[in-house]
Structures are given as structure tokens and as C-alpha cells.
Curated annotation (Swiss-Prot):
KW S-adenosyl-L-methionine (keyword) present: no
Keyword Membrane: yes
Positions of transmembrane segments: 6-26, 49-69, 79-99, 111-131, 143-163, 167-187, 206-226, 236-256, 307-327, 333-353
UniProt xrefs under InterPro entries: EutH
Organism per entry: Bacillus subtilis (strain 168)
A Pfam cross-reference name: EutH
NCBIfam families reported in the protein's UniProt record: PRK15086.1-2 (NF011666), PRK15086.1-3 (NF011667)
Higher taxonomy: Bacteria, Bacillati, Bacillota, Bacilli, Bacillales
Protein name as annotated: Uncharacterized protein YxeR
Molecular functions (GO terms): ethanolamine transmembrane transporter activity
């Protein structure tokens, strides 16, 4: 049995445990998380089915534009899609359509699509609607640090997956350059960059809904609104496969969080993090929205470390594990290693760049929030 097989069997075991707990009235707190996995099909369908169906159309538009430039530097066009899109928001579907080299396409959606893409299209736009305005500087600093370590996570994950280092390097050239540009923009023009990301996130969501509406009308009536779209069954099958994996991943994350609560709190103390910040890091392993919601209650150090870690580390035991295990289980272990490598190095850099505050300073911050 390979490591990837072991990961899938562990997910299956937690799925069964969650299902049993659901039948027994959520006695261990896993049944609710099991149900959450299948309930995720709705949001997944809204963001994915339209993009999956539109993938051939979008690829036909984008390939003539980006392919010559990427080919000139020896990179694959598929890495473009996952530099700006998460795997579950179009990155996976577009990588399949745009890839000239299947290995490069696989590398792109498994690693760039779980680190770089989610930060651009989801983390930054979504966070803006959650965090307090006074936390924008800490958020920008965390994103800046987190983006700088994305290439590290992709490199380590790619090597663990057995990809050629030359291919990895070529396909990380443009993402690394874009990371540097974004980092500079967040440093010098924070408010403008934040507005830009907000608009980009809205634009991607609109494209997804337009695609979903068009393929739904075509399925119901046979009337083709957008020629060249993939049939709706492909998107539905993809979301269903991911939901099955999530029904195991969510209970597993709940179990880890509960079982290792004390050791994780001890680790937080070593990093000079308060309890809220430590809990945020653990929560981000499954999903970072609860962490972002509690950002206002953290110290500045905790805020920066949490955001930096989330760029690569968020969803590693949640939807990204569910997606990769469902679509290409051979990549599951390497994806986990790569995302954690990117997240941990970002958190370490953030800890080094953001000094721990004195107890007196922390009391002052707590008083300002009470």
C-alpha cells in the first residue's frame, strides 16, 4: 500500500465513522462534519459546474493569448490558469484544457491550484468582507509573506510527487514573478491592490454563474446559448466525487483538532501566540474563514502568522485534500507535504518578521477590542 492509498483509506475510515456518528445523533461530533461534507456540494456546484462547462470555451480564448509567451520560456500554458484560479474555481478544469504536457498540467492544478490560485481568487477577496479595516495592514503583510513562500511549497511538493525539477522551475517562473509584483503592490499600494482583488473575485464568480446558467438551459431545453461548452454531467460528477472525499476529510479534521488540542496549545505558547491565534492555525487546516472571522481578537503577531500560513496551508486537510484525493489520489500525500511546507515556512518567516509583544501591549490590545 502506498502513502496515497493510506491517505484515501484514512478518509474512507473517517467517512464511515462520521456516517455512524450521524446515525447515532452526533455523539462524537463527527456526524455533523460528515453531513457538512455532502452539504458542500451546493457551494461547490455554484463555483465549479459553470467553470467546468465553460473550460473548453475559455481555453480556446486564452490559449492563443498566453501560449506563445509561456512556450517561449519553456513553461506550460496550464500554469497560467492555476496562478490566478483555485482548483475548485476553474483551475482544475482549465488546466486540463490548456495543458500541452499532461505532467505540467498535473503539477499546475495540484500545487499552484492549491496555493497560488486560492490566494488570488478566494482568500484575498473573501477576507475583505470579513476582517476589520484596521486589520488590513496585518492582512497585507501576512499575504505578502505567504505569497513569497508559495514557490517553496510548490517545489517541495513537486519533488515529492516525482516531477522533473527543470519542469517545476520553468512553470514557477511566472508565478514567482507575479508573487513579487503582488507583494510589492500590497506593500506600497495596499488599498488599491485590495480593491483590485475584490473586483477580480467578483468577476470570476460572475463567469461561473453565467456558465452554470447557460449549461443548465442547454441541458433543460437543448438550446445552446454558448457554443462549445462541456456537458453538465462532467461538472456534477466532479463535485460529487469531491463531496465524497470531504465527507471523510471534515470528520478527520474535527478529530485531529479535538484530540491534539493540548499539544497544539503548547506549540502556540512556544511561538508566543495567544489561544485565539493558535486555534486559527488549526482551523485553517480545514478552512480559513473561521480564522479570518476571529482575526480581530488576535495580537498583531498572531494575525500576520495566521494569514501568512493560510496562503499555502489553508484547506490542506479540507477541500483541497478532498479534491485531490477524489480526482488524483496518487498526488494526495505530495500535495499535503507541499502545502504544509509553504504554510510552515510562511508562518516561520512571519514569526521572525513580527516580534512578540509584551504582556502590557497585549493587555492594551485586548482592552481596545472589549
Amino acid at each position: 500500500m502506498t502513502v496515497n492509498d493510506a491517505v484515501v483509506f484514512i478518509l474512507a475510515a473517517f467517512l464511515l465513522w462520521g456516517a455512524a456518528d450521524y446515525c447515532l445523533g452526533n455523539r462524537w461530533g463527527l456526524g455533523e462534519r460528515f453531513a457538512d461534507g455532502f452539504k458542500a456540494m451546493g457551494p461547490l456546484a455554484l463555483s465549479m459546474i459553470g467553470i467546468v462547462s465553460l473550460a473548453p470555451v475559455l481555453a480556446a480564448i486564452l490559449i492563443p493569448i498566453v501560449a506563445p509567451f509561456y512556450t517561449a520560456i519553456g513553461a506550460d500554458p496550464s500554469s497560467f490558469a492555476n496562478t490566478i484560479l483555485a482548483i475548485d474555481m476553474g483551475g482544475y478544469a482549465l488546466a486540463g484544457e490548456m495543458a500541452k504536457d499532461p505532467q505540467a498540467g498535473l503539477f499546475s492544478w495540484v500545487f499552484l491550484g492549491t496555493m497560488m490560485g486560492p490566494a488570488i481568487v478566494f482568500t484575498i477577496p473573501v477576507a475583505l468582507g470579513i476582517i476589520e479595516k484596521e486589520d488590513h495592514p496585518y492582512f497585507a503583510k501576512g499575504i505578502l509573506i505567504g505569497l513569497c513562500t508559495v514557490p517553496i511549497g510548490c517545489l517541495i511538493g513537486g519533488l515529492c510527487a516525482g516531477f522533473d525539477i527543470g519542469m517545476i522551475g520553468k512553470n514557477l517562473l511566472i508565478p514567482s514573478l507575479l508573487s513579487a509584483v503582488i507583494a510589492f503592490g500590497l506593500w506600497r499600494y495596499t488599498d488599491r491592490m485590495i480593491q483590485l482583488f475584490h473586483l477580480f473575485g467578483k468577476a470570476v464568480s460572475m463567469v461561473a454563474i453565467i456558465g452554470l446558467a447557460a449549461v443548465s438551459v442547454e441541458t433543460m431545453t437543448g438550446i445552446v446559448l454558448i457554443p462549445g461548452m462541456e456537458n453538465v454531467e462532467t461538472g456534477i460528477q466532479t463535485t460529487g466525487t469531491i463531496a465524497i472525499a470531504l465527507a471523510g476529510a471534515f470528520p478527520m479534521t474535527a478529530f485531529i483538532t479535538k484530540t491534539f488540542k493540548k499539544p497544539l496549545q503548547a506549540l502556540g505558547k512556544c511561538l508566543h501566540l495567544d489561544e485565539t491565534a493558535t486555534a486559527g492555525l488549526v482551523t485553517s487546516l480545514a478552512h480559513h474563514i473561521p480564522m479570518l472571522a476571529s482575526l480581530k481578537d488576535m495580537t498583531p503577531r498572531g494575525k500576520v502568522i495566521n494569514v501568512a500560513f493560510a496562503v499555502s496551508g489553508a484547506f490542506v486537510l479540507g477541500s483541497h485534500l478532498g479534491f485531490v484525493a477524489g480526482m488524483k489520489k496518487e498526488m494526495a500525500a505530495a500535495m499535503i507535504i507541499g502545502k504544509l511546507a509553504g504554510g510552515v515556512t510562511a508562518a516561520a518567516a512571519a514569526a521572525w518578521m513580527t516580534p512578540a509583544q509584551s504582556a502590557k501591549q497585549q493587555k492594551r490590545i485586548s482592552a481596545s477590542h472589549s
